[in-house]
């Protein structure tokens, strides 16, 4: 895992967009993002049990796996959105980027690779893309029945109860 401030320069979303300013795991924790490196599935299973993740599936994001809809899907994943549930991803193979909004609404880019697991809290604005190799295989974990309902950013979603709860949670946390 490597986290840093996104450079906000125009260009392909799959490029690193590394500003050269690193972000610490402590900062990620201050915005509710949890990161783990689990070389074994056993560790993932233990975390799933502890956190009550009862369901899981796997997704391969690549032109070979998705065919003609790949570009459309990657663009959809990159639309800024939130979920009303935690988003848990365990990277089984390949690499990808999660971008999350920091405390001042700026983008933090998190590069994940094989054996990295990330938990995004409900209510955090984020987006996802593969890297320039166009391939990632990820396990998705869910507390209840698998669902993936993105709420794209907008004034109405800013007022969403899950968004407001998230903002209250991080309000008093500050880490450099």
From Swiss-Prot:
One of its GO terms (biological process) is methionine metabolic process. Its main location: cytoplasm. Disulfide bonds: none annotated. Its EC number is 1.13.11.54, 1.13.11.53. Its cofactor is Fe(2+); Ni(2+). It holds the Pfam family ARD. It is found in: Cytoplasm; Nucleus. Residues 1-21 are annotated as: Disordered. It catalyses: 1,2-dihydroxy-5-(methylsulfanyl)pent-1-en-3-one + O2 = 4-methylsulfanyl-2-oxobutanoate + formate + 2 H(+); 1,2-dihydroxy-5-(methylsulfanyl)pent-1-en-3-one + O2 = 3-(methylsulfanyl)propanoate + CO + formate + 2 H(+). Keywords: Amino-acid biosynthesis, Cytoplasm, Dioxygenase, Iron, Metal-binding, Methionine biosynthesis, Nickel, Nucleus, Oxidoreductase. GO terms for molecular function: acireductone dioxygenase (Ni2+-requiring) activity; acireductone dioxygenase [iron(II)-requiring] activity; iron ion binding; nickel cation binding. This is Acireductone dioxygenase. The keyword Nucleotide-binding does not apply. InterPro entries: ARD, ARD_euk, RmlC-like_jellyroll, RmlC_Cupin_sf. GO terms for cellular component: cytoplasm; nucleus. Belongs to the acireductone dioxygenase (ARD) family. Fe(2+) binds at residues 81, 83, 87, 126. Ni(2+) binds at residues 81, 83, 87, 126. It comes from Aspergillus fumigatus (strain ATCC MYA-4609 / CBS 101355 / FGSC A1100 / Af293). Pathway: Amino-acid biosynthesis; L-methionine biosynthesis via salvage pathway; L-methionine from S-methyl-5-thio-alpha-D-ribose 1-phosphate: step 5/6. Binds either 1 Fe or Ni cation per monomer. Iron-binding promotes an acireductone dioxygenase reaction producing 2-keto-4-methylthiobutyrate, while nickel-binding promotes an acireductone dioxygenase reaction producing 3-(methylsulfanyl)propanoate. Catalyzes 2 different reactions between oxygen and the acireductone 1,2-dihydroxy-3-keto-5-methylthiopentene (DHK-MTPene) depending upon the metal bound in the active site. Fe-containing acireductone dioxygenase (Fe-ARD) produces formate and 2-keto-4-methylthiobutyrate (KMTB), the alpha-ketoacid precursor of methionine in the methionine recycle pathway. Ni-containing acireductone dioxygenase (Ni-ARD) produces methylthiopropionate, carbon monoxide and formate, and does not lie on the methionine recycle pathway. Residues 9-20 have a biased composition (Basic and acidic residues).
